[in-house]
Amino acid sequence: MSNGWEPRTRLGRKVADGEITSMQDALQSGLPLKEPELVDQLLPGLEDEVLDINMVQRMTDSGRRVKFRCVVVIGNRDGYVGYAQGRDDQVGGAIQKAIDVAKLNIIDVPLGSGSWEDRPGGRNSLMRRTTGKAGSVEVELKPAPRGLGLAAAPTVRHVLELAGVEDAWTKCHGNTRTTLNLAKATYNALRNASESRTPEHTRQVRQEAQE
């Protein structure tokens, strides 16, 4: 490849050989997504945003060890979004690790105009209500009519914007001051919406790739 990427997986080789030319086809192929470079090939121009940076301390036999934990969301603002956290001794390393894992967690969000107040055929909102959980936090997302905007907390809004959702009602329950769980619950809600239309065999393979 011109960018120096040498595919290591069957899915990667299919992308490199031109057999798979879109992210949608890759996600529906039933093959595990294990190479961040593959996502770069199919979704050039992905944006990333660091939602949270925390210092994590742990006692070891050699003394106190400090690492940084970063929470990152990525997306193309048109139906694709990923989420992950990364840890490293350096902030930059933690961010890059999170970005790479977020690419492996990329999902295809079913955009639409599911609000009864909206005209059918749009892609400004979600198709239907969806919920997601992470820790004590639960996030509910509901379709909203065009022009409403995102009635959401800042963390939830960042995830939805990068996913391409322009209008939505949201509700959050639990300890919503925890950015990590709030972002993950929002991502899980979008993933649940995505999986509601995904064949079972593809869903299982994708889950294996994220573990």
From Swiss-Prot:
GO terms for biological process: translation. Keywords: Ribonucleoprotein, Ribosomal protein, RNA-binding, rRNA-binding. Residues 191-211 are annotated as: Disordered. Residues 46-109 form the S5 DRBM domain. PROSITE patterns: RIBOSOMAL_S5, S5_DSRBD. The keyword Coiled coil does not apply. One of its GO terms (cellular component) is cytosolic small ribosomal subunit. Belongs to the universal ribosomal protein uS5 family. This is Small ribosomal subunit protein uS5.
